Amino acid sequence: KYTNRETAILASKYFAIDFDRKSQAAFMLFRGQKGHEDVEILLAQEFIEGHFAAKITVDSLAKKYAVGRRSFERRFKKATNNTVVEYIQRVKIEAAKRSFESSRKNIHEVMFDVGYTDTKAFRTVFKKITGVTPVEYRNKYNKQVTG
């Protein structure tokens, strides 16, 4: 009544405590871990966030920022506390969560939109990061689909 749907969902994630769960991961908000001073890694993070639907490899990122692969992986892990692959997965899953919250797209459409082509891999990564399946997440946060 006093705000929009996006703000309501955000507030529900901050204040929701679901006691039936083993994990509260579905409510976590990914902020990108940018509180570091490594310029190349910041640029790589911004590139990943802007191009998450494309196929991004560690080698291509290291080459793009003129850093050796091992050095790039080590610096990325030190700066973000995630490996490059974990970070890419988290960005993709965060985009999928936003899509589930705000659109009527089905699981396959969202999966393709965020750059996954394998349903099982998408479900596995989604559940690992959020603690719930994509269907459960969509049903909980998108009342347009269920209501």
Which residues are covered by each model-predicted region?
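Short hydrophobic/aromatic patch on the recognition helix
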Residues: 72, 76, 121-122, 126
